[in-house]
Curated annotation (Swiss-Prot):
Function: Involved in the biosynthesis of lipid A, a phosphorylated glycolipid that anchors the lipopolysaccharide to the outer membrane of the cell.
Catalytic activity: a (3R)-hydroxyacyl-[ACP] + UDP-N-acetyl-alpha-D-glucosamine = a UDP-3-O-[(3R)-3-hydroxyacyl]-N-acetyl-alpha-D-glucosamine + holo-[ACP]
EC number of the protein: 2.3.1.129
UniProt name for this protein: Acyl-[acyl-carrier-protein]--UDP-N-acetylglucosamine O-acyltransferase
Pathway field: Glycolipid biosynthesis; lipid IV(A) biosynthesis; lipid IV(A) from (3R)-3-hydroxytetradecanoyl-[acyl-carrier-protein] and UDP-N-acetyl-alpha-D-glucosamine: step 1/6
InterPro entries: Acetyltransf_C, Acetyltransf_C_sf, Hexapep, Lipid_A_LpxA, Trimer_LpxA-like_sf
Family that this chain belongs to: Belongs to the transferase hexapeptide repeat family. LpxA subfamily.
One Gene Ontology MF term: acyl-[acyl-carrier-protein]-UDP-N-acetylglucosamine O-acyltransferase activity
GO biological process, one term: lipid A biosynthetic process
GO CC field: cytoplasm; membrane
Length: 263
């Protein structure tokens, strides 16, 4: 039977300058503002607001009451043109907020593909989120945070502005990080999170074999358990990286740090 439900609810407000693919659905009382582009297969649920400049890819779902592409919550923002770019296949749950960038922070907020952002998640200005991440309820990313692929952030956890969270990392419930989190690292559920091993279970689920996981564990022990100064730990990691691409990625992440490493 053919679905007779209209694609655009009669109570939705669509700015004439917005560009929506032919099969985009927009629910009741939602607002699509000026300079917004939405790709094919995307569903915008009821009571959502999407402001431009914002570009949204294909097959995304905004469940309801999401506030997307709003002005950055930064007092230095002076109305300059900035944007938000969202990729494909993301699920954005109730009351999620994702803000545009700032002129001083690169001018763009980016969300990749196939991410799940659960209720009340906040992604601030100039954040860059990778692919296949899960942000549980009330996850909070301050401005300029970078999140790698396959990161899981538990409920009520958050990251200080300018922090980086490496690929495959895991932040426990309520964990707050004010330093860079290396790839594969688990952060404990303390008020100020501390390293608590590697995300072994997540790596197994993603197809990492025992040899790769063993190399990552060894690198973690070098960095966090051996009691070495960071400079000495990096020298040992450089040796280990000769036989492990994963360790090489960890070392490159550490070398690129502009904030202190979570220790």
């Amino acid at each position: 039977m053919r679905d007779s439900t209209p694609l655009i609810h009669p109570t939705a407000v669509i700015d004439p300058s917005a560009t929506l693919a032919d099969d985009v659905r927009v629910g009741a009382f939602s607002l699509i503002g000026a300079d917004v582009q939405i790709g094919a297969g995307t569903e915008v649920g009821p009571h959502c607001s999407i402001h431009g400049p914002t570009r949204i890819g294909r097959n995304n779902r905004f469940i309801g009451h999401a506030a997307i592409g709003g002005e950055p919550q930064d007092k230095k923002y002076a109305g300059e043109r900035t944007e938000l770019v969202i990729g494909d296949g993301n699920v954005i749950r109730e009351f999620v907020t994702i803000n545009r960038g700032t002129g001083g922070g690169g001018g763009i907020t980016v969300v990749g593909n196939d991410n799940w952002m659960l209720a009340y998640t906040h992604v601030a200005h100039d954040c860059h989120v990778g692919n296949h991440c899960v942000f549980s309820n009330n996850t909070t990313l301050a401005g300029h945070v970078t999140v790698g692929d396959y990161v899981i952030i538990s409920g009520f956890a958050g990251a200080h502005q300018f922090c980086r969270i490496g690929a495959h990392a895991f932040l426990g419930m309520g964990a707050l990080t004010n330093g860079d989190v290396p790839p594969f690292t688990m952060v404990g559920s303390e008020s100020l999170g501390r390293p608590r091993g590697i995300n072994s279970e997540g790596l197994k689920r993603r197809g990492f074999d025992a040899e790769r996981i063993t190399a990552i564990k060894r690198a973690y022990r070098t960095l966090y358990v051996a009691g070495l100064p960071l400079a000495d730990a990096k020298l040992q990691l450089a040796e280990q990286a000769k036989s492990s691409d994963d360790v090489r990625g960890m070392l490159e992440f550490i070398e690129a740090a502009e904030r202190p490493l979570l220790r």
